[in-house]
């Protein structure tokens, strides 16, 4: 039972290590989505085209992607009929990071540099003095066709050095200018052969597909090599910087996870793992619900995109799953449904104890955290909290509760967005962590097992729990 397991238990260690194996590959939303897709295919899921016809059958398993950076997987219960409900767990694939600008070539004092944009609310000071690599999606032309290529350089190729303290006028604070001081070094003029003869620019029609003048040739050549093409074949790119220092299990008792992108690859991974685990028993054959795990992009910047939680993508999918019933089958299904928004939660920081509300202090190994905010920054209600408590009791997974101080700002999640857009009963939860939005975050090993077990039981038991609520 999850509640009785110590951090050293084999089940805890195994789940944490499997998550780390995933995390070290999921270096961008594109890579995370591909990793999830591979897991689903191995588990017997069928990919559905968003633009094609769907023929949904009971006890079958499917998934659909959006922009290659968001994915929605669903397993149709054996007793499902249009108008039955949805059991949904939602995470997101993105994290605060630096992303390469469309025109990235920069240089200063005999260094070639790469221009980057800040994505989300990162702790940007933590990106200094790190061995950075680059990964993402590259679109190349092949005759009249455009092909998508997923690339990961893996090797450290970029570096943002700190200014020596001897040159600082203010040695007590560090607030870098994110436009002028957050510019990664690529290489020196000397190494680049900057004085070598340059190819003359064409004076004819400028092919808009050719981006060779937008980036340093050395940088674009590196990307082209990874994509298996020539630099002039690259039409566009969507590249992310990341720390090459891999995630790991750390601590004297091996009880912690240290790594990048815990917010929110933990939510994405455990949502999918919970779904897959729920399908191994007999409950799926008799379940009237459709079990759904959704992983959206762009949560860190407000979710307002085609692949974000604010789009109509989720509604369109749910409506298609309700097709074939009465004209109000979709609306009927919403009333029989519940959604868990799985996004990381703040553990109580031992060095900043006063930042946390005195009676709501999530701890490592203390269980999945339920987020409550009366101003609707989180979507949890007493009804959804009670339903989750019943699920947690049956799963034997401990729960914690977090409320922010009245004099403190509060973050938010996709929970209120989807609750508002779809009218879904929603509960906001997350696994406790420290250093949220740093380039390297810190969590406990127990969370992966606890969250996976909770979500698996949620999928298996939700229809019964809801039917027993009066």
Curated annotation (Swiss-Prot):
Effect of residue 92 to F: In M3; results in loss of enzymatic activity
Reported phenotype of the disruption mutant: Animals are viable. Suppresses the abnormal formation of intestinal vacuoles phenotype in mutants lacking the phospholipid-transporting ATPase tat-1 or its chaperone chat-1.
Name of the gene: dnpp-1
Upper lineage: Eukaryota, Metazoa, Ecdysozoa, Nematoda, Chromadorea
UniProt protein name: Aspartyl aminopeptidase
Cofactor: binding details: Binds 2 Zn(2+) ions per subunit.
GO MF annotation, one: zinc ion binding
Annotated Zn(2+) 1 binding sites: 92, 263, 343
Effect on the protein of changing residue 331 to L: In qx49; loss of enzymatic activity
Cysteine pairs bridged by disulfides in the record: none
């Amino acid at each position: 039972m999850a509640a009785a397991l110590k951090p050293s238990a084999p089940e805890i260690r195994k789940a944490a290590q499997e998550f780390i194996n995933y995390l070290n590959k999921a270096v961008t939303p594109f890579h995370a989505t591909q990793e999830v897709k591979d897991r689903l295919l191995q588990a017997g899921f069928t990919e559905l085209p968003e633009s094609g016809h769907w023929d949904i059958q009971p006890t079958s398993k499917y998934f659909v992607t959006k922009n290659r950076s968001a994915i929605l997987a669903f397993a149709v219960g054996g007793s499902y009929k249009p108008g039955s409900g949805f059991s949904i767990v939602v995470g997101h694939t993105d994290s605060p990071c630096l992303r390469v600008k469309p025109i990235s070539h920069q240089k200063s004092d005999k260094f070639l540099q790469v221009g980057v944009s800040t994505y989300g609310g990162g702790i940007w000071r933590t990106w200094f003095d790190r061995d950075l690599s680059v990964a993402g999606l590259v679109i190349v032309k092949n005759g009249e066709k455009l092909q998508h290529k997923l690339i990961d350089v893996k090797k450290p190729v970029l570096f943002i050095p700190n200014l020596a303290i001897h040159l600082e006028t203010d040695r007590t604070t560090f607030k870098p200018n994110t436009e002028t001081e957050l510019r990664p070094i690529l290489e020196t003029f000397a190494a680049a052969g900057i004085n070598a003869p340059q190819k003359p620019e064409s004076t004819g029609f400028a092919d808009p597909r050719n981006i060779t003048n937008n980036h340093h040739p050395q940088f674009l050549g590196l990307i082209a090599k990874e994509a298996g093409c020539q630099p002039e074949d690259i039409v566009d790119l969507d590249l992310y910087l990341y720390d090459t220092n891999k995630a790991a299990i750390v601590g004297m008792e091996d009880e912690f996870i240290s790594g990048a992108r815990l917010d929110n690859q933990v939510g994405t991974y455990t949502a999918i793992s919970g779904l897959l685990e729920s399908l191994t028993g007999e409950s799926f054959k008799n379940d009237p619900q459709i079990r759904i795990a959704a992983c959206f992009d762009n949560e860190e910047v407000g979710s307002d995109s085609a692949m974000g939680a604010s789009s109509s993508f989720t509604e369109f999918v749910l409506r298609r799953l309700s097709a074939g019933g009465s004209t109000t089958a979709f609306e009927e299904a919403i009333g029989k449904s519940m959604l868990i928004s799985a996004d990381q939660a703040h553990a109580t920081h031992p060095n900043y104890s006063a930042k946390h509300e005195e009676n709501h202090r999530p701890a490592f190994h203390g269980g999945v955290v339920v987020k409550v905010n009366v101003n609707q920054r989180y979507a949890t209600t007493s009804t959804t909290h009670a339903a989750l408590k019943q699920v947690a009791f049956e799963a034997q997974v401990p729960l914690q509760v977090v409320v922010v101080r009245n004099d403190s700002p509060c973050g938010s999640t996709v929970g209120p967005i989807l609750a508002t857009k779809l009218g879904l009963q929603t509960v906001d939860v997350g696994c406790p962590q420290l250093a949220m939005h740093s380039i390297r975050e810190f969590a406990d090993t127990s969370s992966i097992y606890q969250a996976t077990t909770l979500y698996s039981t949620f999928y298996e038991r939700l229809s019964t729990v809801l039917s027993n609520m009066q």
